[in-house]
Amino acid sequence: MEINRIDSYDDDRFDKEVLKQHGAFLVDGQYPCSFRIVDEKTAVVGYHNYEGIEELIEEFRFYAEHITCFLDEQGNLLKEYPRVKIFDLELDQIQPSQFFVDEDKLKAVASFVRVPEDVVIPVMRMENTNQYISQDGHTRMYCACQKGIRTVKAFLVGEENDYISYFVKEARNRGIYKISDMQVLSHEEYTEKWHRFCDEYFSSREQD
């Protein structure tokens, strides 16, 4: 099974709400699968065949581990995991692991980021500090910061690893210590600079 996540906010195969929640996936290049988050722990799964749905759920939870209860479109339980603790976190306590914000993506998320509950992010504790490292959700956090939102919702995803440590070190070398320090770039420049940085890093790891 080949599973690809849809990063666009404009795709006629999926409901707008699903796209905003990053819950759209394409299976084997042709079968749409949607995850519509309905509360802080539950998502409704839309798919043509629920056999083997667990692999799709696991792929979705790679990006949204805080969602632990999955229902089909008739409300029947498909899969349930132990609940994940979600807590309030000050934006200024969060060390980014990225450097740039995509201007187009920022405009898109601005339409639905209104309150802290709209931003739920995976974080890691930063050693020997009261800071946390953000693993994802940088655009939503930057948007929240722009709108004067001071706290977001967060959940822990494990301990700092080598690649996150390197990305954080690079961020700090560039003067990025909090979300508001990140640089907004055009979509084209973001794609070129961020993808090049990631490609070069992971390519060097493969050669080690």
Model segments located where?
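Basic- and aromatic-enriched surface patches that contact anionic nucleotides/nucleic acids
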Residues: 2-23, 128-208
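Short alpha-helix boundary/capping and kink motifs at helix termini
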Residues: 4-135, 145
